[in-house]
């Protein structure tokens, strides 16, 4: 009888421990998702603030939205805008990878500002560099670009 009681107590302790671990994992997952969403918002805000506070970069982005193509920018301005677009594309790729890993859900793409990448200039940069991105990201992003 004593042994049975000890085994029952041991079993209940094990079940209780597993339940506790499950709750902790769920809370940790929520915390990671929250921190990741905050990081994405911070990155978007930082990029927007950088453009807003740098007169030259703001002018370049305005030209991008006006439909200019890569050949209409001098080499230095082209490099500035190229680096800005590539930084944004890597951010979008990172969001995709985090969705693939189950850290984020598709709502994360609601905040990426696709018009930036749908511009003539953005499309040129994407077409010239897409081979350097995750092979599963490329068709996903191209489909995302086509959806209005």
What is each model feature region?
Residues 1-31, 35:
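Membrane-embedded hydrophobic alpha-helical segments
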Residues 27-148:
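Amphipathic alpha-helical "stem/stalk" segments
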